[in-house]
């Protein structure tokens, strides 16, 4: 059941989202600014009407949906910040939703509009999120203690290999 009296509590917000909304906002602003830069300086784009682009877009979109649904089933929102999930997708990466934002959002937008520059934005987004997620991980260490520290040493942040 939805607990409306705690809905606007900063503690509730931090437990559910933490750096997600500001990070997503920063990522979308970077994508927007990159597209504006391309338009202002008439930077060459690639053709988007080719079948290989459509197939690649579809496959990456399916992968994104797979990750998001697997995340939801690995740790339902009601358990976030209350229970450390180390199974499911969380046994491969610690921040699957942020992985989607960093990689899939940029790549899918690039494929949609034919932007080379958006592909170069991926490492920048990766560094941005790596810095931002430190605060969330400190928060999680405060909740779960040594269990989360051990989890951090065994599972990488965004990419399923160390």
Regions found by a protein language model. Name each.
Residues 1-86, 101-162:
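Membrane-anchoring alpha-helices and their flanking helix-loop junctions
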Residues 91-103:
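Membrane-interface loop-to-helix entry segments
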């Amino acid at each position: 059941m939805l607990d409306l009296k705690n809905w606007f509590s900063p503690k509730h917000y931090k437990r559910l989202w933490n750096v997600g909304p500001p990070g997503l906002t920063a990522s979308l602003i970077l994508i927007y600014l990159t597209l504006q830069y391309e338009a202002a300086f008439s930077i060459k784009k690639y053709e988007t009407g080719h079948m290989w682009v459509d197939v690649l877009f579809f496959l990456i979109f399916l992968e994104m949906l797979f990750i998001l649904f697997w995340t939801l089933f690995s740790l339902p929102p009601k358990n976030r910040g209350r229970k450390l999930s180390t199974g499911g997708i969380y046994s491969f990466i610690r921040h699957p939703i942020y992985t989607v934002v960093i990689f899939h959002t940029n790549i899918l937008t690039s494929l949609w509009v034919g932007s080379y520059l958006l592909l170069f934005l991926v490492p920048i987004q990766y560094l941005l999120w790596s810095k931002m997620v430190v605060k969330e991980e400190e928060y999680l260490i405060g909740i779960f203690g040594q269990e989360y520290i051990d989890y951090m040493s065994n599972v990488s942040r965004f990419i399923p290999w160390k």
